[in-house]
Amino acid sequence: MEEYNKAVEEFRKHEYPMLKDAVYLDHAGTTLYSKSLMERYMGDMMSNLYGNPHSASTSSQLSTSRIENTRLNVLQFFNADPEDFDVVFVANATAGIKLVMDAFRCQEDGFLYGYHQDSHTSLVGVREDAVSSRCLDDDAVECWLSGSEALVRNEHNSEIGLFAYPAQSNLDGRRLPLSWPERVRNLSYEAQANTYTLLDASALVSTSPLDLSDVSKAPDFTVLSFYKIFGFPDLGALIVRKDSGAILQTRKYFGGGTVEVVVCLKEQWHAPKGQSLHENLEDGTLPFHNIMALEAAIDVHKSLYGSMECIANHTTFLARKLYEGLKSLQHANSEPACIIYSPGFSETSSNVQGPTIAFNVKNSFGAWVTNVEFERLASIKNYHIRTGGLCNPGGVASALELQPWETRRNFSAGLRCGGETDIYAGKITGVIRVSLGAMSTMSDVDSFLSFVNEFFVDHTVVSADEDGESQKSVDMYVESLTIYPIKSCGGFEIPKETAWEVRPEGLAWDREWCLIHQGTGQALSQKRYPRMALIKPTIDFDLGLLKLRYQGSTFPTLVDEISVSLSSDPSSYKNPNNIHSLSSRVCGDAIAAQTYFDHEINDFFSKILEAPCVLARFPAGGSGPSLRHAKAHMQKHQGPKRSAAIEKSSAHSFHDPPTPPDSDSENRKRPILLSNESPILAINRSSINMLNEEIAKSGGKLASASVFRGNIVLASTELTDSHHPYSEDHWSTLQIGSETYQMLGSCRRCHMICVDQDTAEKNEEPFVTLAKTRRFESKVFFGSHMCHVPSFSRHKKHQFPVIKVGDKVSIGL
């Protein structure tokens, strides 16, 4: 039954003076120690003489006696019979997990490992020592426990398994069934297998009881940290079910205090202690002062709060109020302010949700408020919370719908937990966590809700046109979108209705890879290797892969398809530690690109092009030789050209005059990847039509838009002065959909545009005709360079700029 403990309000000021002017909501990290505990501990230390428990003096024997008393108190705290359980003192829950892992990895055939997706990082890390491992969600666990599938794939004939999970998620407070250990034990008996259970009880026991009175239902191994319950001391425990303890004694390492005798000279032999499990597992001198503090902590905690059931009722009452309060916060336009990831509280059961709430905040336009912004303001106002990934990788990925390739991509882009950036590609990468403890009060909840309401809820309706985005369309639209993931190779036409991400470097995944000649270090291009046009890419977001096929004549032993991860996985490169990288040249720039070491990948390209080459990547976010900038600039032939119709049309689009060539905006360095001169290349369909009319007069082969390898083809339904052939020479800005783009200048052309992108055959057109009609100062131009202009709008759509086929286009002159 949920019940608020008013007594906490009466003693909190005296027992927790450190809370003055602070609202502490990070009890999942550690709860707070009471004044009474510290005074009692200090008095104990000042009144008694304690020696090292490995000695035989009276002071040492006193320490030993107090340690064993505390060990028994811990078992009683969890209703665990000392006949059935033993307590091993460790530094923290992570140390307990590692102790279990050390024993399991010593098994002759290794061990199989399954862990729940809500597991703390410390549980996830055990997989590195298992011969096979698997991350399971609720459904997968149920399938396994029902006998319909194995825990993990067993390719190593391992007979030992370990299943680990948290009793309560440290991320969002969700509680998992405590019935699983018994079901695992029953399943192991039926299958004549041997799978043990490891329960991470750290988050649960901070505010709720853990009852181990029924040994048949108890986990084999339970880990916890006492500072999460009492605030002090910094100590943990591994509670071992004695029937399962034999496997822990198979570990090879032994430390001081765990052996009866050791032989070093001439022979290597030792005799481990064997009277109890903990004697064999507690390496070195125990943190005996902390253990004595634990004895005091248990007593003081009971005197202040009564039972753990009372604390559970109190914190559940507060957590429900907090959850409902956050859920009810709405902006003036009725949009929710908080996106909550915790499961919440049902009317029939309060045992599915702990007093930990995970959420994020959105503004009234649906855009994410960054965790960094929220935490900074909270810190200034003296609210103590936690943000980020919370050391729960599976839980945060599930809550935020982050695919593995997205997480790896975010890492490659420089995103780190605790960093300044936590939104990438329109997705937030962390959460805000508030957690309650035994000494939390209703005033803490009310104060925090008021804080969120005051600073993150819009109480007046803000017009969607506040940024002056509404413009009159001039009847142009995006006809097609194409990216070229590998420089000079085939293009991937973006499907209609697919909103494609626009990055500072250009369209997502455009020209992020290249092929480098192993001898010269030069990036390959169609000028010398026209067959590159027939290497066709596909972006598979479901699998997180860039897939590549060759559509020309087949080569002996050539595989049909290869793929590389979209994420910048360091293990794929020749130098995974980025100590060295391959120096190359792209369009005259010296660059440092990371090369792939996979022979199948590199042989695929080398066979097709009949040249020794390697695939290399030049991902966004680099610096120094891993960073390039746009070179495009306005040409002399692109001076102002305005008719009356254009002047009228311009009045409804962009009001600012074109920037002079020496202005800051013109000279600003714009990042690019492996494109020749600019982030984005646009082609005007009416200009292609005009060009083909000229080619037809001489009987030449008409040009497809694909030979110009543009990212965007713009078309119009009406022929007006704003978008007649080559009118792009005089455009200053474009608004495509809701995003703004700045024109950077005309694109200079070479004879590579004569390569047919479907056959790889070379023709003289369209270069010959362009040389007659579009030559200025001995240079041939066709198409326009452009870049995206970031918006400072609070609107959701500007947090993740996109473009799609069919978008309307407005022109600024």
Swiss-Prot record:
Active site as annotated: 391
Transmembrane segments: none
Pfam families: Aminotran_5, MOSC, MOSC_N
UniProt domain MOSC: residue ranges: 648-812
Biased amino acid composition, Basic residues: 628-640
This enzyme's EC code(s): 2.8.1.9
Record has Transferase as a keyword: yes
Protein's UniProt keywords contain Transferase: yes
Signal peptide: none
Cofactor(s) needed: pyridoxal 5'-phosphate
Single annotated GO MF: lyase activity
BP terms from Gene Ontology: Mo-molybdopterin cofactor biosynthetic process
Region ranges (Disordered): 625-670
Keyword list, A-Z: Molybdenum cofactor biosynthesis, Pyridoxal phosphate, Transferase
Reactions this protein catalyses: Mo-molybdopterin + L-cysteine + AH2 = thio-Mo-molybdopterin + L-alanine + A + H2O
Residues with PTM N6-(pyridoxal phosphate)lysine: 228
PROSITE patterns: MOSC (PS51340)
PANTHER family in the cross-refs: MITOCHONDRIAL AMIDOXIME REDUCING COMPONENT 1, MOLYBDOPTERIN COFACTOR SULFURASE MOSC
Function: Sulfurates the molybdenum cofactor. Sulfation of molybdenum is essential for xanthine dehydrogenase (XDH) and aldehyde oxidase (ADO) enzymes in which molybdenum cofactor is liganded by 1 oxygen and 1 sulfur atom in active form.
Recorded family membership: Belongs to the class-V pyridoxal-phosphate-dependent aminotransferase family. MOCOS subfamily.
Protein name: Molybdenum cofactor sulfurase
Native source organism of the sequence: Botryotinia fuckeliana (strain B05.10) (Noble rot fungus)
High-level lineage: Eukaryota, Fungi, Dikarya, Ascomycota, Pezizomycotina
Gene: hxB
